[in-house]
Amino acid sequence: MNLHEYQAKQLFAEYGLPVSEGFACDTPQEAAEAADKIGGDMWVVKTQVHAGGRGKAGGVKLVKSKEEIKEFAQHWLGKNLVTYQTDANGQPVAKILVESCTDIANELYLGAVVDRASQRVVFMASTEGGVDIEKIAEETPELIHQAEIDPLVGAQPYQARELGFKLGLNPTQMKQFVKIFMGLAKMFEDCDFALLEINPLVITDEGNLHCLDGKIGIDGNAIYRQPKMRAFHDPSQEDEREAHAAQWELNYVALDGTVGCMVNGAGLAMGTMDIVNLHGGKPANFLDVGGGANKERVSEAFKIILSDDNVKAVLVNIFGGIVRCDMIAEGIIGAVKEVGVKVPVVVRLEGTNAELGREVLKNSGLDIIAAESLTDAATKVVAAAEGK
């Protein structure tokens, strides 16, 4: 689960990190009034969406009057912002963040992630702030400095100082950096973060460190014990199909291909997507119906897949271990009848009661294409999606 920038900065302030004074506003009038509360003669206005690249898309602007703030808010509130990180439809803008203007002498990067390889939280810092960390990692990885946090002792001030020396900070800035580092480490653990970025962490003209932006991702598996984080949830920023799938305990991720995939098991689902690609097709989604799939969930899975207008064919790939293939077959038949599937459906069943499942499909009287193997299924569904 991701947070908006204004929510991230609210947490930063609670943990004693230096952030700009700002207000998240729902209306143009409220945005203009926020400028009066902040004071000064120059402000920054930012659209609040769960995506990067806002500046290049026109979603961030430096303004010098309340009229400009109003115009910006009127232009964006209720509309969708399209960036390189969104799909073609973009993300809806429901809030505008109005902030005081901060002078910038230099831009740094500071972030943290859960590193699966070392099984630890790893902090990353770089002198190359203001650009994508992925780009830095690819082009100049030597400019990224890391500090692994030992889970037994937690973050230590000496680790912050080591990073600070590599960033070229002076003694005054070093003290500030240690405070920021320790605050972020505590916040990361307290709130069950999966990702944290301050990009950029700026050095002002006065030589002070300041958190100019904030990006936070919460570990979805920990939301149950984080009521405060759960309250930050903004469903408008999620794909409607993914949100609907979650209600049925279906793991669904929308993609941009034409072959809908319904599979039980995440590993098999990824393998199915790979083999569809191998045979010249493009998956329209990742969908894991799980080990406890029943007729109702299979039916909902079909509805979700077919709600994507790009889907030209559907591949159902089921390995019957916990779940019985004949039950899945009945679910497929019920779903096809209920939903009124108009695209070709290719089904491959293996495992518990696979023969019985195939027999059920064969006797259904529906136009369902049976596949003998995964390769056969991929070949048939790609051909069907291409209208062959």
Curated annotation (Swiss-Prot):
<feature type="binding site">
    <location>
        <begin position="321"/>
        <end position="323"/>
    </location>
    <ligand>
        <name>substrate</name>
    </ligand>
</feature>
<dbReference type="GO" id="GO:0000287">
    <property type="term" value="F:magnesium ion binding"/>
</dbReference>
<dbReference type="InterPro" id="IPR013650">
    <property type="entry name" value="ATP-grasp_succ-CoA_synth-type"/>
</dbReference>
<feature type="binding site">
    <location>
        <position position="46"/>
    </location>
    <ligand>
        <name>ATP</name>
    </ligand>
</feature>
<dbReference type="GO" id="GO:0042709">
    <property type="term" value="C:succinate-CoA ligase complex"/>
</dbReference>
<comment type="similarity">
    <text>Belongs to the succinate/malate CoA ligase beta subunit family.</text>
</comment>
<dbReference type="GO" id="GO:0004775">
    <property type="term" value="F:succinate-CoA ligase (ADP-forming) activity"/>
</dbReference>
<dbReference type="Pfam" id="PF00549">
    <property type="entry name" value="Ligase_CoA"/>
</dbReference>
<dbReference type="GO" id="GO:0006104">
    <property type="term" value="P:succinyl-CoA metabolic process"/>
</dbReference>
<dbReference type="InterPro" id="IPR017866">
    <property type="entry name" value="Succ-CoA_synthase_bsu_CS"/>
</dbReference>
<keyword id="KW-0547">Nucleotide-binding</keyword>
<keyword id="KW-0479">Metal-binding</keyword>
<dbReference type="InterPro" id="IPR005811">
    <property type="entry name" value="SUCC_ACL_C"/>
</dbReference>
<keyword id="KW-0436">Ligase</keyword>
<dbReference type="InterPro" id="IPR011761">
    <property type="entry name" value="ATP-grasp"/>
</dbReference>
<protein>
    <recommendedName>
        <fullName>Succinate--CoA ligase [ADP-forming] subunit beta</fullName>
        <ecNumber>6.2.1.5</ecNumber>
    </recommendedName>
</protein>
<feature type="binding site">
    <location>
        <begin position="53"/>
        <end position="55"/>
    </location>
    <ligand>
        <name>ATP</name>
    </ligand>
</feature>
<dbReference type="Pfam" id="PF08442">
    <property type="entry name" value="ATP-grasp_2"/>
</dbReference>
<feature type="binding site">
    <location>
        <position position="107"/>
    </location>
    <ligand>
        <name>ATP</name>
    </ligand>
</feature>
<feature type="binding site">
    <location>
        <position position="264"/>
    </location>
    <ligand>
        <name>substrate</name>
    </ligand>
</feature>
<feature type="binding site">
    <location>
        <position position="199"/>
    </location>
    <ligand>
        <name>Mg(2+)</name>
    </ligand>
</feature>
<dbReference type="GO" id="GO:0005524">
    <property type="term" value="F:ATP binding"/>
</dbReference>
<dbReference type="InterPro" id="IPR005809">
    <property type="entry name" value="Succ_CoA_ligase-like_bsu"/>
</dbReference>
<keyword id="KW-0067">ATP-binding</keyword>
<dbReference type="InterPro" id="IPR013815">
    <property type="entry name" value="ATP_grasp_subdomain_1"/>
</dbReference>
<comment type="subunit">
    <text>Heterotetramer of two alpha and two beta subunits.</text>
</comment>
<comment type="function">
    <text>Succinyl-CoA synthetase functions in the citric acid cycle (TCA), coupling the hydrolysis of succinyl-CoA to the synthesis of either ATP or GTP and thus represents the only step of substrate-level phosphorylation in the TCA. The beta subunit provides nucleotide specificity of the enzyme and binds the substrate succinate, while the binding sites for coenzyme A and phosphate are found in the alpha subunit.</text>
</comment>
<feature type="binding site">
    <location>
        <position position="102"/>
    </location>
    <ligand>
        <name>ATP</name>
    </ligand>
</feature>
<comment type="pathway">
    <text>Carbohydrate metabolism; tricarboxylic acid cycle; succinate from succinyl-CoA (ligase route): step 1/1.</text>
</comment>
<feature type="domain" description="ATP-grasp">
    <location>
        <begin position="9"/>
        <end position="244"/>
    </location>
</feature>
<keyword id="KW-0460">Magnesium</keyword>
<dbReference type="GO" id="GO:0005829">
    <property type="term" value="C:cytosol"/>
</dbReference>
<dbReference type="InterPro" id="IPR016102">
    <property type="entry name" value="Succinyl-CoA_synth-like"/>
</dbReference>
<dbReference type="GO" id="GO:0004776">
    <property type="term" value="F:succinate-CoA ligase (GDP-forming) activity"/>
</dbReference>
<feature type="binding site">
    <location>
        <position position="99"/>
    </location>
    <ligand>
        <name>ATP</name>
    </ligand>
</feature>
<feature type="binding site">
    <location>
        <position position="213"/>
    </location>
    <ligand>
        <name>Mg(2+)</name>
    </ligand>
</feature>
<dbReference type="GO" id="GO:0006099">
    <property type="term" value="P:tricarboxylic acid cycle"/>
</dbReference>
<keyword id="KW-0816">Tricarboxylic acid cycle</keyword>
